[in-house]
């Protein structure tokens, strides 16, 4: 699939071969013509993300890769989508809105209240996590300056869990398995 995007700010300083997040999906710039960036999404990318549902003229979230030494805001986002979620609803809360997203277990297993999640490339703080869904608080600034203003119930979004949780799980898995084996051995001996 070929995606050509009028990028304006994201095009500044961007060259062919650079990585750019498109709705939270890390893609490589295949061509650049002024402010138009063209990307090619592989079949595997389309199977694992919501990019196939993009419509011509629709808004997307774009972000260039962070340069080493740059100001760090939000959380570590790689553009490696862990699953596709769906907008379940939104409701006002003061000046903000609470948005609820249905999410697969591949994302929810790393979700903790007050932790971080990436929704369509937007770093957001989790308000609550339940079986099958999570909520985030969306400020007016975020809604206005991202594609959230164009989303509604039932729309699909790309989700990326906080990578720190994935690394912690990977590092601890052998120890947890050894502990479980030891615990079973003790129970069998008793």
Question: PLM features: residue spans?
Answer:
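Conserved loop->alpha-helix
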Residues: 1-190
């Amino acid at each position: 699939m070929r995606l050509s995007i009028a990028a304006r700010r994201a095009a500044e300083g961007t060259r062919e071969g650079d990585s750019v997040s498109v709705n939270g999906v890390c893609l490589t710039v295949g061509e650049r013509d002024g402010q138009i960036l063209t990307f090619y999404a592989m079949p595997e990318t389309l199977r694992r993300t919501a990019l196939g549902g993009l419509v011509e003229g629709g808004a997307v979230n774009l972000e260039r890769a962070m340069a080493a030494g740059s100001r760090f805001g939000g959380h570590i986002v790689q553009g490696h989508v862990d699953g596709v979620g769906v907008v379940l609803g939104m409701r006002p809360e003061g000046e903000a809105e609470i948005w609820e997203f249905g999410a697969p277990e591949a994302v929810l297993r790393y979700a903790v209240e007050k932790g971080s999640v990436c929704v369509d490339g937007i770093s957001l703080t989790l308000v609550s996590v339940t079986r099958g869904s999570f909520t985030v608080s969306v400020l007016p600034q975020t809604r206005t300056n991202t594609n959230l203003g164009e989303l509604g119930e039932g729309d699909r979004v790309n989700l990326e869990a906080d990578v720190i949780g994935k690394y912690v799980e990977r590092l601890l898995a052998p120890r947890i398995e050894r502990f479980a084996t030891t615990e079973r051995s003790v129970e069998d001996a008793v």
